[in-house]
Design a protein with these regions (language model features):
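Hydrophobic alpha-helix immediately C-terminal to the catalytic Tyr-X-X-X-Lys motif of short-chain
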Residues: 6, 10, 14, 44, ...
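Flexible, glycine-rich beta-alpha linker
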Residues: 20-40, 62-63
């Protein structure tokens, strides 16, 4: 999280100092085909399929804003060809953290609907047709209990709305995972 925040600050500084239009996107828990094997959903799928114990942190009490890859791509495509502009209504005493007087902008790309991690795991079990075994563990240092994107500015500026229901996205992920790993 610290590196992401410092990246945004550096982008803002360049935009401000050199009047360079810069747009950043914040992606929220991206999942789908070609997901990395070290990410939670692929670990859960692998564990359920292979009867391995699933490590579930924060005793399963996490909430995440899962965003299907197609929705992420659509969101990025909406903003990529529109350079950021200065916000002439920006007021330093009550700043809008997503804009400034510099040509700089930040957009959240997410589903806008945090889901309980255990609901996601149970949905994976339903799709696979098999129950998983769990090892519930405390929250890892530096982790957060919940992520939740506010995509209202992206919706307002670019008419963006995520369109993939999470159950459909999970079905596509499991289908891809089985095809990729088992032929």
């Amino acid at each position: 999280a610290a590196t992401k925040a410092s990246n945004e600050l550096m982008a803002f500084s360049y935009s401000h100092l050199f009047n360079i239009p810069l747009t950043g996107v914040r992606l929220f828990t991206v999942y789908g085909p070609w997901d990395r094997p070290d990410m939670a959903l692929c670990k859960f799928i692998n564990g359920i399929l292979n009867d391995q114990e699933l490590q579930v942190f924060n005793f399963g009490n996490h909430r995440r804003d899962f965003t299907y890859i197609d929705d992420v791509v659509n969101g990025v495509l909406k903003v990529i060809n529109t350079p950021a502009r200065s916000n002439n209504d920006w007021i330093g005493e009550i700043p809008d953290p997503g804009t400034s007087q510099s040509p700089w902008r930040i957009y959240n790309i997410g589903s806008g609907e945090p889901l309980d991690l255990m609901d996601i795991i149970h949905e994976l079990e339903r799709i696979i047709g098999k129950k998983g075994r769990y090892q519930f563990l405390p929250m890892q240092p530096g982790d957060v209990h919940e992520t939740h994107s506010d995509v209202s500015v992206l919706a307002q500026d670019f008419d963006f709305q995520p369109t993939t229901p999470y159950k459909l996205g999970l079905e596509k992920l499991v289908e891809w995972y089985k095809r990729y790993h088992f032929g």
